[in-house]
Amino acid sequence: MVIGDAIIDEYLYVDPMGKSAKENMIATRFRDREVFAGGVFAAANHVASICKEVEIITTIGEVDSYRELIESSLKKNIKLTCLSRENKPTTRKSRFIDPGYMRKLFEVYHFDDSPLNSNETNWLAEQIKKHSPNSDLIIVTDFGHGLLNAHTISILCDSAPFLAVNTQTNSANLGYNLITKYPRADFVCIDAPEAQLAVIDRFSSIEKIIGERNIDMARIVGKQRKLDFNKNNKLDK
């Protein structure tokens, strides 16, 4: 089972033309547009390539839902269970790209990251309880956009047979979406800055942060390298 934030990744390819004569901004010429199902959907598609069955649990927006794109993007062995949130959009991240150098010029978030209301939280909690007993593994892709709260995280930690967690720090949640939200995780995927934020330590090495500070899990995988621990939770050199 994969549970996490629904994200639509939009790429707008534009040619910079120069500074506007009357405004302090760069004018661009539109060239092309690509839209992909990202976030929890991208993670589930990867998992589906090596697993027989994958279940996605998430929420999408009632406004600009992109449901057709999402459903057409998923592999055949993936089952989608999602709730539409009233008067909210599916999170869409629009990146404006200079195609000449494939450089991102700037990004626009179309989203509402307010927490789930009580009815939505109850729905998510029931789905976790329903599907956890039949799952070999639960993967959490927590991008910090309002899907998971303390209540549903607690249920995940109590019910998952094996819990793998990625808590991403991004421009929308800097400092508010840390791995320390999860009292239990069997497998954690964070990068060095995310580990530093979790223990409020800007300058120590990543080995010291994980080996000596309060990040207690069997294995941590970063985006740049892997760090393994022995049975005594000591860093293997």
Predicted features and spans:
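Ribokinase/PfkB-type carbohydrate-kinase core domain
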Residues: 1-23, 29-237
